[in-house]
């Protein structure tokens, strides 16, 4: 019985990689079917289910709201359409940016649409749903070859990393790269120095306030939870900061689509969520997380696997 018999401190909805586009079904580079028009139906079912639950404090969308294959003259309308569907949830919705978001719209347009409270184009932020908890949302495309203007220092830094780490002409290809070096591809990104300092200060503040922390980011932060080609460029730097604090219990991500779960050497739970995009018609992938004082419990629907994160 234990905590399962008690009421959670709070609960929140989760969904990842909706990647809607008004185009025919296709396949990923690995040949996995993608159901571009159906994904909005997955989201609609998710919102209905979350509202029926009646006690979800908020929803987190783990990024990639619209797909990169969305015709560019439809990018703005498609993003607005999906945001409108999310806003049918009876509560706050927190978004983060993924690579597919940035293939469609520049940050200056995207952040206001998604109501991301960043400054100067930055998309990282934190909030406290209850006094006991802090939620941190990272911007995994802070250092990125997409989304910033071409002359922006973050674009230049990203292109330099790709030039140094990836010898392929196609910088989206990990061909010839081995193990975790496969992460140095254009569709991934990194967390910049300013954001690293911010993360450290937020975690220090949470620790001083005896708050537990849930870290969210579109791009996975551990080689144990996702494909080596779907990792944050500087996951090691981010995790070195996170591991300084006992307060961080869970790192949630999307991006890798197939889903994954891993507990690292410091006892931090990593969970990459199954993509809404890859649900055949009539199937679904979304869920909600019950947060207790001593554990978190992901209650998944259909293709999203339920997971207990025991502290």
Curated annotation (Swiss-Prot):
It comes from the Eukaryota. Its cofactor is Mg(2+). CDD domains: MPP_Nbla03831 (cd07396). Zn(2+) 2 binds at residues 64, 99, 218, 255. Signal peptide: none annotated. Zn(2+) 1 binds at residues 17, 19, 64, 257. Disulfide bonds: none annotated. It holds the Pfam family Metallophos. It catalyses: CDP-choline + H2O = phosphocholine + CMP + 2 H(+); ADP-D-ribose + H2O = D-ribose 5-phosphate + AMP + 2 H(+); CDP-glycerol + H2O = sn-glycerol 3-phosphate + CMP + 2 H(+). Keywords: Hydrolase, Metal-binding, Zinc. InterPro entries: Calcineurin-like_PHP_ApaH, Metallo-depent_PP-like, MPP_ADPRM. Its EC number is 3.6.1.13, 3.6.1.16, 3.6.1.53. One of its GO terms (molecular function) is CDP-glycerol diphosphatase activity. Hydrolyzes ADP-ribose, IDP-ribose, CDP-glycerol, CDP-choline and CDP-ethanolamine, but not other non-reducing ADP-sugars or CDP-glucose. Belongs to the ADPRibase-Mn family. PANTHER family: MANGANESE-DEPENDENT ADP-RIBOSE_CDP-ALCOHOL DIPHOSPHATASE, PTHR16509. Monomer. This is Manganese-dependent ADP-ribose/CDP-alcohol diphosphatase.
